[in-house]
């Protein structure tokens, strides 16, 4: 084994080792999820050296410099105010979803007008209109981190794969017998998973355009999908009050997470895939041990349905958004509520962390989006201007641009 080079991963903090083994180029990651501005770097370097044979004494200084760079990035204080940069009257009919590519250089909008549009973030110009679906385009996603492909899921029961660069349609995936309402790429960008009102999830092979798997077992529609970081597990959240954990590529159901008393609204893995967070209409969020499928905590406090849940990029914080107009931040390890985000005058349907984990953005039916400090719960800014409820919001990877999507048929870029 011979170490070729180091790659730095800022969020969540880590060092990727590129090495040669038997003539093949391979990579492995050293996760530094606990790294903070006060961490003793020499101690960390020592621990890495003990655990990782590729890091020899001659590399010590290099590794130390990399960790110092990561530390500097984590410690950067960001007091930026966001300003409205562009209002895009994206579609004639209502929007369904908005999503960024990883760098944030472009984003996509889905709509009831049966199209998905690709936009240049810097100029606000439309790059492509992806046409071909025969009904509402509901679920949309880039294959991040690559960002060269887009998947669209439609009420016409099909999923389509497109080139982000040219707008060309590569494949139309047919097989679902009802509307597709969620979809996700696996991290390797070799598979797309789709969830449908027909109670099944399907996996599609990006290369061949063929169906790879059907995951059956839920008793109601599947409305949430999440791959783990390595891509060998997929979770499906359903209106049947349960979440299933599937092994990929075998398609075997490993666990069914039973305990919620209402429909599931969202289900997510944390970064190291040790935990699964589930949000439900039963007003609670639950944390589950992903290895044994046992519930390890029920996060209570909301007075109404929990509509969204998300982890920060390291997996140390869990944030929930509720129909009660508040959001909450919990510690994933202590399971204690760290902050209550209060100020919205309507339900919060979407909540996102920036990659750095020091900001949260929320989307609400009160026509505003708000920016928060997740550690103090302080509202730092109210993004006003939409004239109808906001159902979608997203940060780009750098955290310096936000997009919001509203029922007023506009998409706003804030930077």
Curated annotation (Swiss-Prot):
WD repeats: 90-129, 132-174, 175-214, 217-256, 259-298, 301-340, 343-384, 386-415
Keyword Repeat set for record: yes
Keywords: Cell projection, Cilium, Cytoplasm, Cytoskeleton, Flagellum, Repeat, WD repeat
Intracellular or extracellular location(s): Cytoplasm, Cytoskeleton, Flagellum basal body; Cytoplasm, Cytoskeleton, Flagellum axoneme
InterPro entries according to UniProt: G-protein_beta_WD-40_rep, WD40/YVTN_repeat-like_dom_sf, WD40_repeat_CS, WD40_repeat_dom_sf, WD40_rpt
BP GO terms, sorted: intraciliary transport; outer dynein arm assembly
Entries under CDD domains matching the protein: WD40
Gene Ontology CC annotation, any one: ciliary basal body
Function, as annotated: Required for axonemal dynein assembly and ciliary motility in ciliated organs, including Kupffer's vesicle, during embryogenesis. Facilitates the onset of robust cilia motility during development.
Family listed: Belongs to the WD repeat WDR69 family.
Protein name: Dynein assembly factor with WD repeat domains 1
Source organism (scientific name): Xenopus laevis
């Amino acid at each position: 084994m011979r170490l070729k080079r180091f790659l730095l991963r800022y969020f969540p903090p880590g060092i990727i080792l590129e090495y040669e083994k038997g003539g093949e180029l391979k990579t492995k990651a050293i996760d530094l999820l606990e790294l903070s501005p006060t961490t003793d770097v020499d101690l960390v370097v020592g621990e890495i050296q003990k655990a990782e044979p590729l890091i020899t004494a001659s590399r010590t200084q290099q590794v130390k410099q990399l960790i110092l760079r990561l530390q500097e990035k984590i410690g950067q204080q960001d007091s930026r105010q966001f300003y409205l940069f562009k209002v895009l009257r994206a579609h004639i009919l209502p929007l369904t979803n908005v999503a960024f590519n990883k760098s944030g250089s472009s984003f996509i909008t889905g709509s009831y007008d049966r199209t998905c549009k690709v936009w240049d973030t810097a100029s606000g110009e439309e790059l492509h209109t992806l046409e071909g679906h025969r009904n509402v385009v509901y679920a949309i996603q880039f294959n991040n981190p690559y960002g060269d492909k887009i998947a669209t899921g439609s009420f016409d029961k099909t999923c389509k794969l497109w080139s982000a660069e040219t707008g060309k349609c590569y494949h139309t995936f047919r097989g679902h017998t009802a509307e597709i309402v969620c979809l996700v790429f696996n991290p390797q960008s070799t598979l797309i998973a789709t969830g449908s009102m027909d109670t099944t999830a399907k996996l599609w092979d990006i290369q061949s355009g063929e169906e790879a798997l059907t995951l059956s077992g839920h008793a109601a529609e599947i409305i949430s999908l999440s791959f783990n970081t390595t891509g060998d597990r997929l979770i499906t959240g359903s209106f049947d009050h349960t979440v299933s954990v599937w092994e990929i590529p075998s398609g075997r159901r490993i666990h069914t997470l039973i305990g919620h008393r209402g429909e599931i609204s969202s289900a997510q893995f944390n970064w190291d895939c040790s935990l699964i967070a589930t949000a439900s209409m039963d007003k609670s969020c639950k944390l589950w041990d992903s290895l044994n499928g046992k519930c390890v905590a029920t996060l209570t406090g909301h007075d109404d349905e929990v509509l969204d849940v998300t982890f920060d990029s390291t997996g140390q914080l869990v944030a929930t958004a509720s129909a009660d107009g508040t959001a909450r931040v919990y510690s994933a390890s202590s399971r204690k509520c760290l902050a209550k985000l209060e100020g919205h005058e309507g339900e919060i349907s979407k909540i996102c962390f920036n990659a750095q984990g020091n900001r949260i953005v929320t989307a609400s039916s009160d026509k505003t989006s708000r920016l928060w400090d997740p550690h103090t719960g302080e509202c730092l800014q109210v993004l006003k201007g939409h004239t109808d409820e906001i159902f979608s919001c997203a940060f780009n990877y750098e955290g310096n641009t936000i997009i919001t999507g509203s029922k007023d048929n506009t998409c706003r870029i804030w930077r």
